[in-house]
Amino acid sequence: MNPNQKIICISATGMTLSVVSLLVGIANLGLNIGLHYKVGYTPDVNTPNVNGTNSTTTTIINNNTQNNFTNITNIIQNKNEERTFLNLTKPLCEVNSWHILSKDNAIRIGEDANILVTREPYLSCDPQGCRMFALSQGTTLKGRHANGTIHDRSPFRALVSWEMGQAPSPYNAKIECIGWSSTSCHDGISRMSICMSGPNNNASAVVWYGGRPVTEIPSWAGNILRTQESECVCHKGICPVVMTDGPANNKAATKIIYFKEGKIQKIEELTGTAQHIEECSCYGAKEVIKCICRDNWKGANRPVITIDPDMMTHTSKYLCSKILTDTSRPNDPNNGNCDAPITGGGPDPGVKGFAFLDGENSWLGRTISKDSRSGYEVLKVPNAETNTQSGPITHQIIVNNQNWSGYSGAFIDYWANKECFNPCFYVELIRGRPKESSVLWTSNSIVALCGSRERLGSWSWHDGAEITYFK
């Protein structure tokens, strides 16, 4: 074989080996891609949820050569593993005073940041923690659309939630449902949220569960179908919700609707001696749910609805104590009334409020002013639910009477690792119109406190924004 033939032979052999190597590489790449997509498209029903990833990185430097080794461990959990319905078996914790839990300072921050205009706020917890909720007005404090947000009902309102302690903004708020009245609660497996929307004479409710709309409820009295404006409570999957449709200053039609996974299980007309029900603040303990409400028609004493979620039944009455907790209200009388409203007070027909009724361990919240939504205090009133002579044995200032308050309501972190359910409450700190007409908007910040067995001091947790900075 001459030299030219040798060169041609060697070249041909090299080219053949190169082509074979290229084909092997292509086949290997195709096999890897195919296996990747085969795993990635395995049906969800056969694939456990990947709930988290732990990774650790080790760096070793030898003779100026750096090697990085990363170990990745996937934490695998089957769907609904360790997820069960909340069971309200524990009692309330003993409370001797209240410690601060959260304060969002939304109005102060909103002076130079994009903060949502809200009202009717509350807190609600789930197995992962607690979130703040409110009805947004679809605009920010600095936006021109903030003009006119003193009005309660519009097509632009939505129930939003955000991480506890932050101020609500367009960037951190999650829309739960659309509407101008709401409630929301977690049953241990998923969250149910309810929003009312529509015109006054034909409003409707949409019930969401697990992030999807499940049930729709039409108006039954044609007069502002509305609900609690704070969290509902669930027991063994049953979540009762109090709804009212009808006049705010006369007899209205109230119903207790029992839901499971967003679907109606039973509807009850209001029974008992309560004459008017709005904006109930509910909590659960010892397999009973108690709702402390607002009588916007007659009573300066608050109506109480006691619900048995196992039997899906209820009764209603009035808070027996002579300590009146609605606003406006007359002076505290010498005797309370368990079965009828106590009338009197100024022109303001009422405000949302709360109480925890637990025998000797009972606490009531109210504005300090009898006539307006200013200041806020909580009073320990043993046996307030049953004793017409019961009076306060201690109290704690939450907001001093030189500052505005607003709605208040109950909530509990039912998943906290305690031997009892620790009572918590929030106070809405309203700013802007109508009391502060130099700005165009009406909005709020939130302060929240929880019970303590210790005897802690009082402080004023007022909003703290300088309205003059907004001019």
UniProtKB/Swiss-Prot annotation:
A GO biological process held by the record: viral budding from plasma membrane
- EC numbers for this chain: 3.2.1.18
Question: Which parts of the sequence are annotated with region: Hypervariable stalk region?
Answer: 36-89
Question: What domain of life does the native source organism fall in?
Answer: Viruses
| Entry's transmembrane regions | 7-27
**Active-site feature positions:** 152, 407
A GO-annotated cellular component: virion membrane
Q: Where is this region: Involved in apical transport and lipid raft association?
A: 11-33
Q: Please give the residue ranges for the topological domain Virion surface.
A: 28-471
List positions binding substrate: 119, 153, 278-279, 294, 373
Q: Does the keyword Hydrolase apply?
A: yes
- Modification after translation (UniProt): N-glycosylated.
Q: Which Gene3D superfamilies match?
A: 2.120.10.10
Q: Which cofactor does it need?
A: Ca(2+)
Q: Which residues are glycosylated?
A: 51, 54, 63, 68, 71, 87, 147, 202, 403
Q: Catalytic activity annotated for this protein?
A: Hydrolysis of alpha-(2->3)-, alpha-(2->6)-, alpha-(2->8)- glycosidic linkages of terminal sialic acid residues in oligosaccharides, glycoproteins, glycolipids, colominic acid and synthetic substrates
**Disulphide bond pairs:** 93-420, 125-130, 185-232, 234-239, 280-293, 282-291, 320-338, 424-450
For the ligand (Ca(2+)), the binding residues are 295, 299, 326
Summarize the activity regulation.
Answer: Inhibited by the neuraminidase inhibitors zanamivir (Relenza) and oseltamivir (Tamiflu). These drugs interfere with the release of progeny virus from infected cells and are effective against all influenza strains. Resistance to neuraminidase inhibitors is quite rare.
Keyword flag Nucleotide-binding: no
Other facts noted in the record for this chain: The influenza A genome consist of 8 RNA segments. Genetic variation of hemagglutinin and/or neuraminidase genes results in the emergence of new influenza strains. The mechanism of variation can be the result of point mutations or the result of genetic reassortment between segments of two different strains.
Q: What is the annotated quaternary arrangement, including any partners?
A: Homotetramer.
Q: Which HAMAP family match?
A: INFV_NRAM
- This protein is called what? Neuraminidase
- Its gene is NA
